């Protein structure tokens, strides 16, 4: 969602063409600073880090420290080890904590009768372990380095944040974590390594060697007939994001005939929105009627056949129906994405009142909001889906036009995964 990033060649996706909203990246109402994610092939990421250090100076660049905290099970095990509780007892107690992500010890004592019984009726040592673990839970346990986060300062980083030498790298590391770094005005850059970009790069080198044809991935036509046929037939094993059995089945039913269909499928094929894939397919092929609550909604939902698929569509509709500013629309998008219930309730009143001021039927408006609340559970942004579909199309194009050279690269980059090697070898046959 940035014209500047497009013009500089940081991204090859033209935001205006695909309706990507700038307000997701920058807007006057945004409180937090944006961060910038850039994907490189594996070799390119290392080169970029070296380039940044050389260009700006080693003392201007730093990786970002992360802090690992004691979760419920680890708190029990750590305290048990220090208090010399036998390891089998330690593992037994930790095993009584429900396996649900984010479960605290307080919740565990409420949900697990066995664990609660140990707290109330266990041995003196077990009670001591559990009570101390309860106090220590959430404490910082260790430090690490953010997998891809880097900050670049206008001068010596230590003028802004405390730094330390990194034990695993020759780059400095901040002693503040990401949120604190943002509070002093530093912007985080994420330099990500994506193996599929390495596969594309090596496949293009294979093609050049065997055919003398130089393929430039950024110039691959996104309406290429042979590539779209490959998607329509579900022959996407070895491609980016579209190789699962479920996705292949949906592609055969959808028969995508334009790049935008692939963007939508990438967003829909996730827990939650998957339930709407049959409706999406039936509406595309005219087997199900496309219904809009208000005529104005067609402008924003026609590309997804009347189904709200992207966060950006909610942003656009909130502006069109209720008169939200672009900044307010992004605030709604963020509240949905991060499940900020309190913020959503505040915006609900503004949305209802704004729609009423524009003479929209309240019952229908209430229904739209309730649909959006459900949508918040799985909301995905179009900017990400477009980028993923773009890389997926490049991989599919190479497979469709140069199968030997492409699959050779796929196999080379999966040599350590016996299961994938078996699957991809079978695909090559």
Language-model-detected regions and their locations in the chain:
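Noncatalytic, beta-rich nucleic-acid-contacting surfaces in large DNA/RNA-processing enzymes
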Residues: 1-429
């Amino acid at each position: 969602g940035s014209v500047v990033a497009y013009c500089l060649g940081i991204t090859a996706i033209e935001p205006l063409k695909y309706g990507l909203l700038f307000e997701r990246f920058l807007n006057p109402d945004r409180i937090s600073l944006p961060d910038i994610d850039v994907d490189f092939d594996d070799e390119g990421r290392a080169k970029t880090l070296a380039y940044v250090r050389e260009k700006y100076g080693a003392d201007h660049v730093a990786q970002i420290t992360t802090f690992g905290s004691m979760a419920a099970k680890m708190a029990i095990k750590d305290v048990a080890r220090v208090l010399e509780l036998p390891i089998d007892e330690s593992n037994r107690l930790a095993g009584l904590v429900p396996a649900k992500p984010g479960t605290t010890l307080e919740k565990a004592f409420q949900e697990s009768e066995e664990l609660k019984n140990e707290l109330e009726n266990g041995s003196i040592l077990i009670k001591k372990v559990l009570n101390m673990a309860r106090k220590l839970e959430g404490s910082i346990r260790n430090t690490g380095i953010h997998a891809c986060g880097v900050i670049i300062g206008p001068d010596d980083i230590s003028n802004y944040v405390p730094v330390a030498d990194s034990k695993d790298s020759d780059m400095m590391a901040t002693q503040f974590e990401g949120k604190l770094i943002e509070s002093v005005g530093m912007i985080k850059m994420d330099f990500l390594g994506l193996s599929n970009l390495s596969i594309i790069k090596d496949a293009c080198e294979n093609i050049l060697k065997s055919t003398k044809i130089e393929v430039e991935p950024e110039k691959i036509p996104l309406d290429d007939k042979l590539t779209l046929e490959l998607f329509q037939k579900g022959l996407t094993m070895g491609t980016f994001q579209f190789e699962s059995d479920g996705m292949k089945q949906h592609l055969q039913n959808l028969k995508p005939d334009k790049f935008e269909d692939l963007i939508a499928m990438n967003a829909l094929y996730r827990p939650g929105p998957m339930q709407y894939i049959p409706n999406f397919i039936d509406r595309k092929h005219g087997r199900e009627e496309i219904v809009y609550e208000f005529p104005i909604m067609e402008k924003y939902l026609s590309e997804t056949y009347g189904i709200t698929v992207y966060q950006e569509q909610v942003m656009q509709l909130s502006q069109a129906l209720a008169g939200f500013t672009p900044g307010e629309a992004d605030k709604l998008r963020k509240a949905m994405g991060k499940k900020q219930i309190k913020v959503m309730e505040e915006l609900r009143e503004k949305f209802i009142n704004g729609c009423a001021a524009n003479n929209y039927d309240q019952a229908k408006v209430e229904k739209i909001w309730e649909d959006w609340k459900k949508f918040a559970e799985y909301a995905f942004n179009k900017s990400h889906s477009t980028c993923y579909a773009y890389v997926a199309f490049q991989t599919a194009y190479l497979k469709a036009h140069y199968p030997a050279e492409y699959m050779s690269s796929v196999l080379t980059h999966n040599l350590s995964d016996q299961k994938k090697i078996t699957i991809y070898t079978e695909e090559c046959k």
